[in-house]
Amino acid sequence: MKKINFILLFLLALSISTFAQKRTNEGLDTRDLYSDTWVATDAIGRTMPTNAETGDIKDDKRRVVGIFYITWHTQNIHSWKSPYAADVTKILAQDPEARKDTNHKLWQNDAYHYHYAEPEMGYFLSQDEWVIRKDISMLTDAGVDVLIMDVTNAVHYWDEWEVIFQTMQKVKAEGNPVPKFCFWAYNGPVITVVQELFNRIYKENKYSDLWFYWDEKPLLLYNSDPHHNASGGWVENPNPNYYEAAATDPNDPHYNNPDYTQKSLTDYTNEVKEFFTLRNMWWGYYEWAGKQYIGTEDNWSFGYSLADDRILNMSPEELLSTHNGKREQAAVTPAQHPVTMTENPMGVGKSWTRRFGEPQLNEYDMPEVGYIPYLNQVKENPVLYGAYFQESWDYALKGDPEFLYINDWNEWTAMKFNLPPNSPWLGRYNSFMFVDQYNMEFNRGIQPMKGGYGDNYYMQMAQNIRRYKGSRPIPQHLGYAECKIDGRFGDWKHNTIEYRDTHGDTFHRDAKGYAGLHYTNTSGRNDIITSKVAVGKDDISFYVETVEKFTPHTDPNWMLLLIDADNNSSTGWYGYDFIINKSIKSDRLTTLMQYDSEKGEWCHAADIAMRYADNHLELSISREALNLTGDSFTFDFKWTDNPAGLDNPISLCLDGDTAPNRRFNYRMIWRKE
């Protein structure tokens, strides 16, 4: 979304009995992955809160999380000039002086949209099904319920929506949970835009299994007063429903119905008003269209203008939008903008805090040092820590609304605007500016980036959504369960505790990207869906199941099992102390290897029994070898197949399959009785 703003003189327009029940609100065919019981430690040491911190699933009221989902990376962008070099972070890394000169050679003359940094999945386009599947998986794992589709600038992305919604239906048909969707329209001929959405999707009952309902009707976020918007005021709204017979033929079914007789519309049609639950949504200014906006009835915000002291001094409860006097909606953003719409020319970035504002920027327009309130520490490279994001979450959690809106997931690009010489921007005089995002500090993105802050903001979002919604207790294994490693797998039928993973995440990639780029990924191989663990008197046994028959064990990086035996993320290889199947001796014998931190390598620890047949695999490890010999213990584990390498946890995120997804782990808790 591009929010067009005025700057300077410019108009820049959930107790578990058998841990295998389904969530009733997801439907009988949806397979519960229990992602709210997964554990993780992110790149800066923050951990996923468990039931001990969050409490049980909170059922005191509706608790819904929506996220702004961008689809403007359209297919035509593939034809842009190659090679693609419109990446602000890479431009400034080459020559930081480019930040001062709009005519610098590194600013491509034919590029008006720039990435602030490279996405983890490359410079993708919105019809890339591989990316869409990754997005849906990440968002549902984190607890996101609804995608807010962007129509804020009066552009319909019909082709992109078609691919996205069809992909969501495929993922749903595979038994996975998926979010719902709704639309947000605001600027331009918004009445026409909304009518076209209604006519082509809702009236045609397209993708109705994916519609998001609020107060028993599909939700539409819109502009309740089309005479006031961010693109300059009223524009004509042609009526898509108009036809002459409705005005002239008494026998016509719509005779004298103003929804059909007006060539231009000055208000939304009755069918739109009756069909949807409507909520006005725009930026959280203190005043908008001549009256107070923030904290008022039915006026949702997609962020708060914290550069305005009137808003900065409001309590969490005062920031909330209400409906019939009840706290309804709050916004959470990772940052704001490189511009503030105030007399202060400094932006509000990811390291901005209520106490200290934006840290001093270096020659790359990045903060080198900043205060992190939730740590009560000053940190180097503060952008890694999400100071603004956490303050935003803290306020929203205290306000405790029914709907949390997060802005945004995947916008990535922004327009570069030329300015007159000596125009104030980012605390200096400059000849150009970016409004919505600029670099790694000044952006509102959460989707993981390549390098930089990586998936820190995604993990931070998942941590806080769990605090908002609560979570289920991690199931506990009681007593001994002996399993014979014989390739028959019958012992496992009585083990009711399942650790589950997404079905279909070995999908292969073959898609166009920005400016001639083409992305392929055929690493998806063994699609892991279920695993189990059993503790015997002397051994711990593991079982794993895939969708289809296993590929041969001689394949590279085949069905690796990683174990954090000491439950300490700071030891071993990113917390993992042992790995199984890194070296396989035969189809019945594999190895247990232990990580040697001093050598920085995996070393042989023991040979262990393994059997696999069709889509089932089992193996057994001595408890003594894992240092798990007591009457109770806890350890974390994950399966991964065909990662490109074992460089860091992100190595497990993009290639092959990992169960559970990304850097999440399953937690196994056992006691003797």
Regions found by a protein language model. Give the residues of each.
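The substrate-binding groove and active-site-proximal loops of carbohydrate-active enzymes
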Residues: W38-D42, H113-D128, V144-V155, P179-I191, ...
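Short, well-ordered beta-strand segments enriched in hydrophobic/aromatic residues
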Residues: G487, D538-E548, L617-R623
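Loop/turn elements at helix/coil->beta-strand transitions in domains of secreted/extracellular proteins
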Residues: D60-G66, A142-L147, E174-F181, Y207-D209, ...
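Aromatic-rich peripheral "rim/lid" segments of glycoside hydrolase catalytic domains that contact
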Residues: K170-V171, N418-F489
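Aromatic-lined glycan-binding groove of carbohydrate-active enzymes
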Residues: A52, K58-H78, N223-G386, A396-L397, ...
